[in-house]
């Protein structure tokens, strides 16, 4: 596993130069893995790890305590998630936008993640709730 991680770091970054339009397959895979890792840390309430996936610009303006307060207050579906799926991934200017559906049992939430790549390192800048709906139960 360490060899795979090391070899992944040594290759040229798929985020070196961003071109507007749909994400490439490799970009989508890396973005999905980054968001999945952050959501996994959030669901375990491992705030230092979850915070480490945030963009440096986000970390410069929001401290870890405020990050935890925002997540627990506005994004409880990330803590209680029972699965996530990924929709469209698109690049606009210097940002990467990824649609994410979070299933938290009786509720599904559509979020739009905004990521940036600084020095070829991905970071989550924002996650906005687009839509929340209750699952129909019969």
Residue ranges and their predicted role:
Residues 1-2:
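Sec-dependent N-terminal signal peptides
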Residues 83-138:
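Exposed beta-sheet edge and beta->alpha loop/turn motif
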